Amino acid sequence: MKNKDYPLRSSMDELSTKNDNEIDLEKGPLPEYNSEDESTLPPYSEIWKYIKTVSEDSSTGPTETTNPNVERRQEFKDSHPNIYSLLRLLISVLAVIVVFFTAWVCVNPLEKSIFGKVAFFVTIGITCPILLITIFCFFETWTQAVAQCIKVTVIFLAQCVKVTAVGLYNSREKWVVIIWLLWVVICYTLFLRSKFGNLNLNKALICSTCSISAALLLFLLYVRLPFWTLKHMFSGLFQVLGVQSCVVIVTKGLTYLFDKHIDATGYEIEASSLFVIGNFLFFYEMECPGALKRMPKFIRNGIASFLEGIGNIGRAFRGANDNNDIPLGEMEVESEV
């Protein structure tokens, strides 16, 4: 009986062997892989591809982000070199003039002795040309520095205002009202002092400032994150100022028509009206948040209701007149029916 030798390798093993023997034309033959060296990886493995990608990215280095303002300035400089040089010279001269007049106002050499005047003009005569040359030569550097300084300052102040407003509003709503009440008391005290005391201040200016400050404090109502937007703040501000403008127009007209019969000046009436309206709108918004945003809709609905009421009254009068025009015989026939 013959012993049949069955192969120990399966069809899958043969397929893998066939694939291993084939050479990829793009990658080339597989190099020998030393498994004893732990730092060596198969060249076509996924980890090797990832490491190669990371090394290529790190070798190229970080890409520098260009400022669009710098690009526009460079384009303008390349296209109009003469105009750009004149602008640099003009701005440099203006900066030197500002420095000169500032030093003149601070020192005031006309009140000094002859030696002081000579020292001042010699110092200015040496400093101003050096400053002009420095500003002109390093124009781009110091303009970028000044722009960056202004930007950082504005952002810092805006963040301070926002953080303060958020802290005030999130602490408790009643504290905001208490602070505003104290402010009203101070303004009202100034108003009384200017009217009956020896404080020589314009009453209209004081009360108008108080009412406008009410509009400015409305931004505390719109600081509830994430609804912090300038749109909400300015909408409340313009609505308050719009109502106050209407009050000013009405009071101006009344004082012009009835000036002889009103025992007060137009400025006092205007100031008092602005003062009352500003405080009323502030507290109304505090009690009903979003009331100022809904105010135009309420005004439109109120005007529509008023006009509709007038129309109903007119129709009622017309109906009554129509009934009065009915002949007496027709009324008797209708009553019999």
UniProtKB/Swiss-Prot annotation:
Transmembrane portions of the chain: 89-109, 119-139, 149-169, 176-196, 210-230, 234-254
An annotated GO cellular component: membrane
Region entry Disordered, spans: 1-40
Basic and acidic residues: compositionally biased ranges: 1-29
Similarity annotation: Belongs to the WTF family.
Protein species of origin: Schizosaccharomyces kambucha
Subunit and interaction comment: Homomer. Forms protein aggregates. The two isoforms can interact with each other and with themselves. High sequence similarity is required for their interaction.
Protein name (Swiss-Prot/TrEMBL): Meiotic driver wtf4
Gene (name only): wtf4
Phenotypic effect of disruption: Sensitises cells to wtf4-encoded poison.
Superkingdom: Eukaryota
Task performed by this protein: Promotes unequal transmission of alleles from the parental zygote to progeny spores by acting as poison/antidote system where the poison and antidote proteins are produced from the same locus; the poison component is trans-acting and targets all spores within an ascus whereas the antidote component is spore-specific, leading to poisoning of all progeny that do not inherit the allele.
BP terms from Gene Ontology: meiotic drive; protein localization to vacuole
InterPro entries: WTF
Top-level taxonomy: Eukaryota, Fungi, Dikarya, Ascomycota, Taphrinomycotina
Keywords, sorted A to Z: Cytoplasm, Endoplasmic reticulum, Membrane, Toxin, Transmembrane, Transmembrane helix, Vacuole
